[in-house]
């Protein structure tokens, strides 16, 4: 008697329990290999009822789906799957895409943007750097470096305009003047420009990048590797790693034979490699008296896996049963090579593309079946109703090719192309998304811990990490609960699916599965991280913000937030990935103001949360407060409601991001309802008596939603340098706006009228300052108007020592427009600077017309208009 017959006779000594488990539950509960028996009534192709099965191992197979071709690139025959470690050689043919779209070459990013192909490849090393501006009104800059390596694959996503800081050569005329008088920092506004960029995804780094049109380098629509692959013969693994699928190949020579091949690849055959699939299979051996029949079961199929009888020796943890299993396993190892079995070429017998409706099945579901595809319902002539989906004609097969196949990117798989690697699924099948099978109709045994909470407690928008941790928390008590129910299930004859059975000494149920680490999250670029965070939380200012002396602390990320819906870029060519170029602080760099600030209205540090103070009449409030809020391009969802909580915000700094496109949520108020203006974080104006009319005007000015002139009257009692520092820390300077009235009388009437038109509100300095302006101090930021001082004002004959305020009066006096006055105020042009300006600077840098330049130059040279 041979060894196989002796081992087969040992089955007579095995007592079989009434416990039946589906295959996926079995492999997740017990250490492999194990011996089980096919349950009565189970219909599995290639197996007989009550066959003994040795569950050999779980393996991960990576295969390439291919179609047979005839001359002229027509698809014929069934689909096949070729393992990635197939030992045969292939030669690349002329590709369909190269015939339709010949290979193109480009010498700059601008040329790529004009043609805008789907993807390009970098043909040489490219390095480029430029200074990025943090915002239009922020003087901070940061150098942005771009490095591209040869062979990088870039998928084009869109275009955007980004703020950049101009180089010193572009403003050298200003530098010469400003260095001479020591005011080089006053030209920051003119050092900003908009740079068109091409938004791309670099597949090597898996990050989005913005390439300026100025960047030069060689690009191509075909990679160098793919061009080099046109010559010679290559393995299928080399082809899928270095070319884009689909690709046409030919078999140049007779390939090696595999005894387990179900499809014979012959010399001269042509194939179209269409996509790549990775799936997890359970390799088993049907144990018979005269032979061993290898079979495998894919875990990612829509049909139910077979139910198997479990022996009593496994449930009781008997050592003699473990010895029997070990002997059978050794015998099977001698009879067949599982690696050869895993490398076999097989026909795709089930149309997984149509069947894979869910993302889980379509992305990782695999395309292969094997010699054992089961269906417990037994419908169909062969027990596999899915086989009816086979393409029946050339047209249907050709239609399949028109579907959008997922192309293989080298950065996704890299060196992780599994050929037949063994994987351990103990305790992971019900947790890992890679291993969990799709739910069949009778899947009452799947995810028992979730069946109890079927009321929808598991939300689809729960973050990935929290979702995993939630599973881990629930795993322990669920297993304990199921152990207690096992006795009742056994006595009932096991008509329903059983929970995990109790593990004996040899069954080795993995109790450590509760502590399994979550599967790795795909890497995200910093731009994507910032964009995802900014959609759900208030933005964080640049790390280079000039906050001095404010207490800061790191803020943990909120656990859950309502998702902002339908947040899209207003421009179809503008991508959110362009936000990655801004100097955003990373995790741990976000700052929050001290507790004495009002969290109901971020971003400025002027407002106090004290309800008693906020309920008082506000003695002086400048309309520019709310104007600065309206200037911000951040979403206004977080400004204007007292019900918002402090923990909903991560940062309260005031910065302007003009290149962050956001859509306002409907119903969001634009106004900032309450708060005290207080630069020194103390109540400077408590106890000050103000008139009720000024209070009314101030309260109406609170809800100003348009830009008004920036006025620092409330800062007049402080030195000028301190005012400059405070202003630069708070909000960007807004251009001045003149009232619609033309005399002081109308201005006073407008100030005392309770009107809702906030654009016309200008508070006089005497009603805003509690102590009045100190003599000798000059407010270089407040831009007053001729009406404020009467019509008798005349510009001085000597302009060298006058202030910015007087320059503004002078410009209005000679009849220049408010746009010109605003530009001079923004650039802080005083008398000394005005005398240094030339016609070239006024026309080219200030963009003045010839008439304006002539009038201003005559004014500088001493001309005064007659009254």
Swiss-Prot record:
- Ranges for domain SAM come to 802-867
Q: Which keywords label this protein?
A: Mitogen, Phosphoprotein
Which stretches does the entry tag as region Disordered?
511-530, 536-594, 735-758
The record ties this protein, via InterPro entries, to: CABIT_dom, GAREM, SAM/pointed_sf
| Record field: compositional bias (Polar residues) | 544-554, 569-581
Positions where Phosphotyrosine occurs in the chain = 464
Instruction: Identify the Pfam families for this entry.
Output: CABIT
Q: Which GO terms describe its molecular function?
A: proline-rich region binding
Cleaved signal peptide residues = none
Region CABIT, annotated ranges: 12-322
- List, in alphabetical order, the GO biological process terms annotated in this UniProt record: cellular response to epidermal growth factor stimulus; epidermal growth factor receptor signaling pathway; positive regulation of cell division; positive regulation of cell population proliferation; positive regulation of ERK1 and ERK2 cascade
Skewed-composition ranges (Basic and acidic residues): 740-749
Return the similarity comment.
Belongs to the GAREM family.
Q: So what does this one do?
A: Adapter protein that may provide a link between cell surface epidermal growth factor receptor and the MAPK/ERK signaling pathway. May promote cell proliferation.
Name of the protein this chain belongs to: GRB2-associated and regulator of MAPK protein 1
